[in-house]
Amino acid sequence: MALVINDRVKETSTTSGTGTLNLAGASQDFISFVSGVGNGNTTYYCITETGTDKFEVGIGTVTDATPDTLSRDTVISNNLGTTNEIDFGSGEKEVFCTIPAVKAMSPVMNPTTYVVTHNSTLSDDQ
């Protein structure tokens, strides 16, 4: 379906391992992935494991189910500096929508003239 990015989308999960995350509902004062992104849509996500330096940023697909889930389709970055799924341990993880740094345009760039190619390097000089 569509790539959807939304503000204030955040849930928790206790799923361990490298697979699809079971989502535990919206964190206080936030909205759920199903409400903010929508069933079947993809989004950029970040997962952080409480009490550790583990994190993963990627693109995932939201599924409205019991429980709601977020698949980890493409990993963009992680704390190991690779594009592999992080093997999260037991315990709580925070999962939220984000825009990965490699996908963000610098505010000093002119979006009408700047073209990103597969080999582009972004800097404030552009």
Predicted segment positions?
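Ser/Thr/Gly-rich low-complexity blocks that favor extended beta-strand/coil architectures
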Residues: 33-59
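Elongated alpha-helical scaffolds
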Residues: 53-71
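Glycine-rich, low-complexity segments
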Residues: 1-25, 29-30, 67, 76-124
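Short, T/G/N/S-enriched strand-turn elements that build extracellular solenoid repeat scaffolds
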Residues: 34, 58, 120-126
